[in-house]
Amino acid sequence: MSNSIFSKIANAVGGKKGRLITLAIWILLVIALQLFLPKAADYKDDAAPDLAASEPSVVAQKVMDEQFPSGEGTPALITWYRSTGLTNADLAQIQQFSKELEQNPIKHQKTAVPYDKMPLPVLKQQVSEDGTTFIQTVLMDSSATSDQLKDSFTELEKTANATFSDKPFKQDVASKDTLVARTTGPAGISVDATELFSDADVSLLIGTVLLVLVFLLVIYRSPILALIPLIAVGFAYLAVTPILGLLGQEGIITYGSQGLSIMTVLLFGAGTDYCLFLIARFRSQLHHDENRYTAFKKAFGNTAGAIALSGFTVMAALLILLVAKYGSIHNFAVPFSLSILIMMISSLTLVPALLGIFGRISFWPFVPRTEAMAKEHATKKGKKVKIHRENRFWHRVGEISAHHPIKTFVITLLILGGCALFATQVKYTYDTLSTFPKDMPSREGFTLISDHFGAGQLAPMNLIVKTNGEKTAMRENLQKTDGIETVSVGVPSTKNRDYTMYTIQLTDNPYSNAAMDLIPDIRDTAQTTMSDAGLSKNNVWIAGQTATQYDSRAVTKDDEALIIPLVIGLIALLLLAYLRSITAMVYLVATVLLSFFSALGLGWVIIHYIMGTEAIAGLIPIYAFVFIVALGEDYNIFMISSIWKKSRELPLREAIAEGVGQTGGVITSAGLILAGTFAVLTTLPIQLLVQFGLITAIGVLLDTFIVRPFLVPAITMLFGKWAFWPGKGHNQEHK
């Protein structure tokens, strides 16, 4: 896009007339969107399936629901515990509570085991061996949302409070000789997961706004300027959320609380960056031009192209998530890319309008002036003239990289490579419970079950086979499989007796990798048993949480294998189109990839060795990769484009020093703010977001302080004129 076009855009959005019109359009647009479109929060769907209907565990669940309707429903496991042992009075009250649930079911309750009809000796047989724990099963409607289940469990606790005098759901698990109750199982876990993200939204928004405000005040020391990016981001947020609400209402897209939380961070982090690139250039230009509109035109012309390319790069990379088969990843694509698009438009229209309105006053009390204006101002005030001097720190950093490229390259490569080596040691988990705080009710309930019964009892899996009435050695063969605790007697379907279901309890945590690794063995055993009986081995289905987690792991790994090359390819093509250099495209992509693996490795050191976490969430690599690579390439684009422009008039060595010097301050500020916004995620009680925020923040910081000022300039210097190949946008002297 030519400078004349940028000049026209600058006039249209930031000129004397255009600035007020642009601001008015934004205000009217946001008001209209807020008044006439639904809120995004009203149409978030935290119960949206992550797996496609064709996945084996989903097919198995459908077969189970059709053939064994009595088992249809989401289990809520009410765990009763007394450290000194459950008393007869406790069990009698549990029976009374069971009777209450049977006579007055809570909302969305399907069935509840009638423990009140069991003789006390029979009931005692279901208590744990140490006599401390009892599990009461209530099946909830599988179509109920997490919010509906939350209301149901609130009602359940009220019923319990009327039955038990000491309010067992409110008691601390560590209490001595006190009856304690917790709701866990798939239903309880679902409710806690949703509540965690719901509680995170407000605190995340407030924390992010405060952090960005503090950073801006420290960097620019101007209250007006600190508010301009926040206003731009705020308007973008108010515009994007109702649009998402409309798309959700119409069923065009699906999104959840997790996506909205990360979108908030993305808007404030990336959005503030885009604003800063323009603001910093505008401030610099005001030291050379008396007319603020002339200064703005030049600043806009020098940054708008890079901002637009940066925005489109991130947006396109995020849209690639649409190819993901795993629901949570796929559902990020539209909210994230739409937020970046609107934020980019805001930074190129609303920010110029605000700068046009406030002009130099934007930077009060440290107003940038030309030398002549500074002398005139000092004379009026009777003060000594303060001539503006550019900060030379980043220029000196650029000189180090340009004058000592080999040393710089080797040192930075050793630092980043050393961190990246730890990425090979990372262990992953797909255990939903491990992402919860230890004091969450469902996790406390699971811990009680695991400690006193066995982890496998939390979520047994179900094996369904179609035997056509033939006898098989299924139960006997399954019991021989390592990792299986118990296998129930086969239960024929009440709808079609050709179908038989076996309930399998594992020795391991059903959400663990060890449990998931058993799925192929169980399937092979079942299929072999069917074949030995002369039956089709295709009529074998495995349902349950472990089977679902197994499919989730497989699908996310497939998504990683597809999305990562696509993102790399896309960014490479965009860089090639913008820089017209194959060489630069290759080493810029390579450096950002190195940033990602270094961040993953260093993040693992902190998470595993310092925080004591055994494994990180399995979704972290793909989450962090897209953000670190896409956002990290932003800084390379801004810096390398500056070097490219300087190299047309200066020798490459000087162009590198000038390019790093010119962009160093603003990129550092932007990097700190972006890393800070992602670091806000580490304050949340959700390990998935803590780990994602930490690793992404590390990646941004590595890119800001090592890759961009040292590694990339050093590589550019080492390549010399070949850094531009096959383009020729450089001076003939490269010394």
Where are the regions that the model predicts?
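N-terminal cofactor/phosphate-binding cores enriched in small/glycine residues
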Residues: 27-29, 39, 45, 50-53, ...
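Short, contiguous strand/loop micro-motifs
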Residues: 47-48, 85, 328, 383-385, ...
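Membrane-embedded transmembrane helical bundles of large multi-pass transporters/channels
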Residues: 1-42, 148-426, 547-735
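Acidic/histidine-rich, surface-exposed loop or edge segments in extracytoplasmic proteins
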Residues: 76-81
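Structured non-transmembrane domains adjacent to transmembrane bundles in polytopic membrane proteins
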Residues: 54-72, 84-179, 425-615
